Amino acid sequence: MKFVDEAAILVVAGDGGNGCVSFRREKYIPNGGPDGGDGGDGGDVYLLADENLNTLIDYRFEKSFRAERGQNGQSRDCTGKRGKDITIKVPVGTRVQDQGTGEILGDMTRHEQRLMVAKGGWHGLGNTRFKSSVNRAPRQKTLGTAGEARDILLELLLLADVGMLGLPNAGKSTFIRAVSAAKPKVADYPFTTLVPSLGVVRMDHEQSFVVADIPGLIEGASDGAGLGIRFLKHLERCRVLLHLVDIAPIDESDPVENAKVIINELNQYSENLSQKPRWLVFNKIDVIGEEEAAERAKAIAEGMGWEGKYYMISAVNREGVNALCWDVMKFINTQPKAMAIEESAPEKVEFMWDDYHREQIAEVEAEADDDWDDDWDEEDDEGVEIIYQK
């Protein structure tokens, strides 16, 4: 299935049903009083995280989702039926953003997590609500409010503990094949990896971590060169980044400059991502002798200004790979889980009409001193008043 990690959709909640103006009519009771019911609330729109999904491709074709409108109120104090909610399933790891305001509405990081993204309109009030000692036959009602409408952007961010960084053909996919059951494509040409992939590294029966491989970066990626930097967002949730450097490039390029290219592109993408723990890993030491590899690694680290520890591995021969994985596992175990997942926005989204009915009743009470009987006509049953919310 094609990997799609972004989709823009329109979500529209249902409108609230209108209130009803009605009067009770029974035999021998000509003036039975008001019995108009309230309308029903509009349906809400929810997102539901589903661990069985791994792409947003469905929403490249279906872009509009509308919840059901609430039914209007009826006579005999019958309240209109509430509109049905609509639930949209998205992969775990989806970030939800309001395109109009840029606000992050939520981060779907848990299976079956629900997030309301559009709230249904409030129901209108029937004329029974407006009955009082000075207005025994009210002809006022209110209309239901419109449902919330949002243009939202769905962004799928992979949930991984470890992220792989490096130029094309640095050996990232080979590394994942060596340490996990994942089988990304490997070849001797650039950009063999076109979409992100995940692999689970099992150290023993109880300990494991997830590693993410993204397409390689090249100089100018921040300006759109190569595959650009759009896939770097999949590393935002990682707790540690492994920066793979080809210690003996086949094109005889300078490994120091190659490493600096990655660091520069990382800085241009996000300050937060550039400050994540990053480990330096020299790959393909099997191409040259052990002593020469050690000398080159030391020289490259000094040229980069690298002061921390670095690793030398051969992903093809699995040389040094196991020790690296155990160090990664120990590091992950010492980090709080919260580091891997950004603090998500609150799931409750505030909407502007939360106090709608309270304000409506307050307005009516404020006008209680007005003489609503001045234009009363015993013969006029059609003079309906509708209160519009400003």
UniProtKB/Swiss-Prot annotation:
Coiled coil: none annotated. Pfam families: GTP1_OBG (PF01018), MMR_HSR1 (PF01926). HAMAP family: GTPase_Obg (MF_01454). Residues 366-384 have a biased composition (Acidic residues). It comes from the Bacteria. An essential GTPase which binds GTP, GDP and possibly (p)ppGpp with moderate affinity, with high nucleotide exchange rates and a fairly low GTP hydrolysis rate. Plays a role in control of the cell cycle, stress response, ribosome biogenesis and in those bacteria that undergo differentiation, in morphogenesis control. It is an enzyme of class 3 (hydrolase). Residues 366-390 are annotated as: Disordered. Mg(2+) binds at residues 173, 193. The keyword Cytoplasm applies. Belongs to the TRAFAC class OBG-HflX-like GTPase superfamily. OBG GTPase family. Monomer. Its EC number is 3.6.5.-. One of its GO terms (molecular function) is GTPase activity. Keywords: Cytoplasm, GTP-binding, Hydrolase, Magnesium, Metal-binding, Nucleotide-binding. Its cofactor is Mg(2+). GTP binds at residues 166-173, 191-195, 213-216, 283-286, 314-316. GO terms for biological process: ribosome biogenesis. Residues 160-333 form the OBG-type G domain. This is GTPase Obg. GO terms for cellular component: cytoplasm. The gene is obg. Residues 1-159 form the Obg domain. It is found in: Cytoplasm.
